């Protein structure tokens, strides 16, 4: 869009095509700083370029500061009201967007519009529950900070259910999700936690469950009801489930740890008994309830420091959702290909909204945050405030490091516990005869240099990443 200057200004000049330009002369001001104001609101999808021929300089205006501070409380995802199904998506620099949806074998496309230039909304008559849908997002890729591609289907980041990691999203309204029953987890200082992978614990479980059920939430629910289930006998009062939010998987039956999330609102379709009908929501809720009936609290291992493939958020806005270097390339302190920009207001909102849903709709008792150093202290503190308002006895645990740094000491004055890698390394040395009693006393006494109280340190010898007595 060409910004037409006021024609009566003394420094207006016209180019060969008759376009009006404002000539800014260093000879007039003696300064190398110019302040340029214009009326109205410029969309972030617009391009504004400044040219200084005398200096041989030209370039686009950088809106990064404005971009990275955009926030909207508007509803996102699919919702039903007043006889219409509406779809809303945050894409602040998109030039156009549409929703492709299919119901009862009939495919349609609905164009979206944006009132504020950030939230795009498309509506269709009727209740579209069960419809499959994708977004199409388009815009001009002026530099490496965007990755728009209208040919690439984009699953809804706020979809409550996915048919598979590759999509499509499934229309499932919040009103149709389960509602959790109250459960009081053990106090932090009484926690005995076992980390488990759903398919690992079911692979050799002695229970009357089929091979297919051994891959699902439902299979673990059935095993928990069996009197021979060792999870009920081993002495733990809490399990930490490795990731169960929708994650990258080539095939539904593939064994994956789950640390490459593609959607934080949909329980994993790979673990559903009937993903075609989005059973994962009810399947997962029943599993949490089964653990609670057995007196066992449920912590989820959650990954908010990076995303997997397909990377849908990079199509919505690469710079808004991801940390970039000066060349516009994705940063990679996670070691997983990208670092999620959690301090962007709508990115942080997405984290909080998904955590709240896991507590309110599924009854989850706590969270272990993968590579929490990348999530950032400010976001972690906001998570603590919001989660403890929602559930005062929520369990919050950080893996307090990344390839960038370590924040265990910085978490000392928060309500987070931290995985203690110092204890892990010391116990290996101790077992090999290289440790001493003073060191043992320090770690068993709560590692008070980084912890305010003993229960704030999570001492462990083995995890999915660390078999330190063998490594």
Language model: regions and residue ranges:
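The feature marks proteins involved in alpha-glucan
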Residues: 26-84, 107-109, 114-195, 201-212, ...
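Short proline/glycine-enriched turn/loop motifs at strand-loop junctions of beta-rich domains
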Residues: 90-96
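Conserved alpha/beta catalytic core and glycan-binding cleft of carbohydrate-active enzymes
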Residues: 159-170, 384-471
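Short beta-strand elements bearing conserved aromatic residues within extracellular beta-rich modules
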Residues: 97-99, 133
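Immunoglobulin-like IPT/TIG beta-sandwich domains and homologous Ig-like subdomains
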Residues: 1-43, 101-104
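Substrate-binding/active-site clefts of carbohydrate-active enzymes
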Residues: 184-188, 197-362, 372, 379-387, ...
């Amino acid at each position: 869009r060409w910004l037409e200057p006021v024609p009566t200004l003394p420094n207006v000049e016209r180019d060969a095509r008759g376009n009006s330009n404002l000539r800014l002369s260093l000879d007039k001001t003696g300064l190398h700083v110019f302040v340029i104001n214009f009326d109205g609101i410029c969309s972030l999808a617009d391009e504004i370029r400044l040219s200084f021929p005398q200096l041989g300089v030209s370039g686009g205006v950088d809106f990064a500061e404005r971009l990275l501070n955009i926030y909207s409380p508007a509803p996102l995802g699919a919702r039903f009201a007043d006889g219409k199904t509406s779809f809303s998506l945050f894409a602040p620099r998109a030039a156009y967007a549409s929703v492709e949806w299919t119901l009862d074998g009939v495919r349609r496309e609905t164009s979206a519009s944006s009132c504020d230039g950030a939230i795009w909304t498309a509506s269709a008559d009727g209740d579209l529950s069960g419809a499959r849908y994708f977004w199409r997002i388009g815009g001009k890729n002026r530099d490496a900070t965007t990755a728009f591609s209208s040919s690439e289907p984009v699953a809804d980041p706020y979809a409550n259910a996915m048919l598979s990691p590759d999509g499509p999203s499934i229309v499932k309204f919040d009103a149709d999700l389960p509602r959790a029953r109250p459960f009081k987890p053990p106090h932090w200082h009484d926690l005995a936690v076992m980390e488990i992978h759903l398919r690992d614990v079911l692979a050799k479980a002695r229970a009357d469950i089929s091979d297919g059920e051994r891959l699902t939430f439902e299979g673990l629910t059935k095993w928990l009801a069996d009197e021979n289930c060792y999870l009920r006998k081993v002495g733990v009062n809490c399990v930490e489930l490795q990731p169960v939010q929708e994650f990258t998987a080539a095939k539904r039956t593939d064994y994956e740890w789950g640390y490459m999330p593609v959607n934080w609102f949909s329980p994993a379709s790979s673990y559903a008994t009937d993903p075609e009908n989005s059973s994962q929501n009810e399947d997962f809720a029943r599993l949490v309830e089964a653990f609670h009936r057995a007196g066992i609290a449920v912590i989820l291992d959650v990954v908010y420091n990076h995303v997997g493939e397909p990377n849908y958020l990079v199509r919505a806005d690469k710079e808004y959702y991801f940390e970039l270097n000066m060349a516009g390339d994705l940063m990679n302190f996670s070691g997983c290909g990208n670092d999620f920009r959690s301090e962007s207001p709508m990115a942080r909102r997405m984290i909080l909204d998904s955590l709240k849903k896991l507590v309110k709709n599924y009854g989850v008792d706590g969270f272990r945050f993968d590579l929490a150093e990348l999530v950032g202290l400010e976001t972690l503190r906001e998570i603590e405030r919001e989660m403890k308002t929602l559930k005062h006895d929520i369990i919050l645990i950080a893996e307090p490091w990344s390839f960038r740094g370590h924040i265990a000491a910085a978490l000392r004055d928060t309500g987070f516990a931290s995985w203690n890698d110092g204890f892990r390394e010391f116990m290996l040395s101790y077992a090999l005869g290289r440790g001493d009693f003073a060191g043992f006393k320090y770690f068993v006494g709560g590692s008070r240099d980084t912890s305010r109280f003993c229960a704030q340190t999570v001492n462990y010898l083995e995890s999915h990443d660390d078999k330190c007595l063998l490594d």
